[in-house]
Amino acid sequence: MQPLPITRSLEHTHSAAAVSTLGTACCSCQLSLACVPCGLSRINQQPHPVMLFSRHRRLAGEILYRKGEPFHAVHAVRSGALKSAMTLADGRTQVAGFHMPGEVLGFDGVASGRHQCTVTALEDTQTCAVAYEPLLALATRLPLVQRDLHRLMSLELARAQWQMLLLGSMSAAERLAALLLDLSRRAAARGHSPTEFNLRMSRCDIGSYLGVTAETVCRLLSGFKASNLLEVDTRRVRFLDLPAFARIYSATVNWRPSRLHGEASARWGQALE
């Protein structure tokens, strides 16, 4: 699958034209503000970026990268959504995460030089790929980029630890509640309503991620609906009383995986009042 061209490839250049092209590519993105918390847009604020930057497009069901493929770049989700999945030797598959616009993925390949999971588009998706070695070189020269790179890696570790807690210590209802609250925060981080959003993933994918069956996911959603906590219309979820939902499942509220800034933080806080 060929990357979707932006304007032209940028590789090891310091020219003013190249800097302008790279900056324009991010400025034209509707999610440029959402990417600032992720850190990658800081690259374009530096005077002399040395980057290889490309945009990729995947249709629903297409692979962004596979387990075992060489690691070359990290990806910022520009639009759409993806899932990452691990496959055991016997063929069993476990969904390991969901990736939304403004978020960064791909760090699973840093340690071994090869990706440890397969990432698939849940819907038509665009990502911006940043070559890792030039990014690492830039981070050694620019403390702000280095700090954000470390924070992104730390976030990946924190997410993995949270998922271990999710699967090992919570009931099925708490697991689903934790995921819904997480998706609510992530919607707020993108500037959307924290009380109404689409589930980009199927019930089967949700069940795989939570370690329960798709039937259990459907039953729990019906239970939340019967309790007048939320409405579910196919993939559309609307919280009827988000503060009450958060209070009932208070054990899940302490985890804030999406770093909220400014208006997004205020939006999430108001939704819980």
Region roles according to the model:
Residues P37, Q46-P47, A60-D124:
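Cyclic nucleotide-binding regulatory domains
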Residues R55, V74, F98, A129, ...:
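Short aromatic/basic micro-patch
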Residues A60, M100-P101, A131, M153, ...:
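A secondary-structure boundary/capping signal
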Residues T140-T213:
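Polybasic "coupling" helices that flank or enter modular domains
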Residues R185-E273:
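Phosphate-/nucleic-acid-contacting segments
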Residues S79, E133-P134, L155, C204, ...:
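Alpha-helix/helix-capping structural signal
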Residues Q2-A60, V104-L105, V110-A111:
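Cyclic nucleotide-binding regulatory module and flanking cytosolic helices
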Residues G97-W162:
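Cyclic-nucleotide recognition modules
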